Amino acid sequence: MSKTYLTEKKFSDFALHPKVIEALEKKGFSNCTQIQALTLPITVKGHDIAGQAQTGTGKTLAFLTSTFHYLLTHPAKEGHEKNQPRALIMAPTRELAVQIYTDAQPLAQSTGVKMGLAYGGDGYDEQLKVLNNGVDIVIGTTGRLIDYVKQGHINLNAIQVVVLDEADRMYDLGFIKDIRWLFRRMPNAAERMNMLFSATLSYRVRELAFEQMNNPEYVEVEPEQKTGFSIKEELFYPSNEEKMRLLQTLIEEEWPERCIIFANTKHRCDDIWAHLAADGHRVGLLTGDVPQKKRLRILEDFTQGNIDILVATDVAARGLHIPSVTHVFNYDLPDDCEDYVHRIGRTGRAGKSGNSISLACEEYALNLPAIETYIQHAIPVSKYNSDALLTDLPEPKRRHRPRQGQPRRNNSAPRRGNNTQRNNRNKRPSHS
């Protein structure tokens, strides 16, 4: 596989609807990524596809472009009613559903295709109001979709396009029964175009494709190493007692423009957030118990640069398109080796370089062999000097203080800091 992010293939090379091409050109999209170049020859013909590609290589635009083209070049079913959308896009998480909806806005504006959201947590009446006015595309999560279908707000009998995004994650979260329930209420597979995209095309994902799709073509964009050529990986072995101080020292030294810190539990994320917030960093927290509106606001602040550091469980590791993440810290090595790939895939996206720093502590170091076997290479190890770790650190603050997005160092610190006491230390660990 070429290491180049974009191919020589252009969107204009395909027989896409002129309004789709117009929307893409307005957003500056000219050349296709590899997954897009493989997908469009299949979908412009209306054929089914099951695609595998590394996270961040353009899967979303591939299926959105295909969906809008299909709806613009095929008439709605005869007798089509207001509560019958023509296309359904299913995502494993609320955040991903919202992200897909946002990414589709330029296409919707140029084409006049109407969209609606359906995800749980909040916004029930607001979502329903949009759906009741009639939409062409519904983007949502399975639970809320089933709710609306059971109540008659959505009827799936006129579906012409189905997209299942992050299919492997759907299995991981236990949504496969919901997916099959929804498929049973649609026209049969031969009467619709079906698209499935996933970071991995495991046996169970292929089985789902066989069940619910019409002889799909399989395409794969598999890098020579699962973690990507553009990501610099690094591993430290801290003791449990030094783990937090090592993280804070690395942040002070690296001073990342935008980074995500992953931990395995909500409690650990709370603790990391409290330490970094007390130290004056602009930090946000994204865990399962954060209310949906607040989660979306935090993601928006992070995307807009109002927050520099996002502390998260794996809820944020899949599907979210957050640009320009320069660093990913694995405070805990994940229990699932695939999650390591998905986590660090938040950086090094769209052809940019990125950095992944992992801490193999006493509790989670046993996860390392499986991870390295899965990614087919050893993660380079760096050593550190315990005496060089930061010591003048404030006590962690309560979760409600300070507010999300508090400026680093009370807005007075420069990007690389002029704290003489800290900068005089040899904080950066030496490489082995």
Curated annotation (Swiss-Prot):
Q: List the NCBIfam families.
A: PRK04837.1 (NF003419)
Does the keyword section mention RNA-binding? yes
Q: Where is this motif: Q motif?
A: 9-37
The compartments listed are: Cytoplasm
Question: Which protein are we looking at?
Answer: ATP-dependent RNA helicase RhlB
Lineage of the organism: Bacteria, Pseudomonadati, Pseudomonadota, Gammaproteobacteria, Enterobacterales
Q: Which GO terms describe its biological process?
A: RNA catabolic process
Which controlled-vocabulary keywords does the entry list? ATP-binding, Cytoplasm, Helicase, Hydrolase, Nucleotide-binding, RNA-binding
Give this protein's Gene Ontology molecular function annotations: ATP binding; ATP hydrolysis activity; RNA binding; RNA helicase activity
Q: Which GO terms describe its cellular component?
A: cytosol
Residues the record lists as binding ATP? A53, Q54, T55, G56, T57, G58, K59, T60
Motif annotated as DEAD box, chain positions? 165-168
- The Helicase ATP-binding domain sits at 40-219
Bias (Low complexity): 404-423
Q: What is its EC number?
A: 3.6.4.13
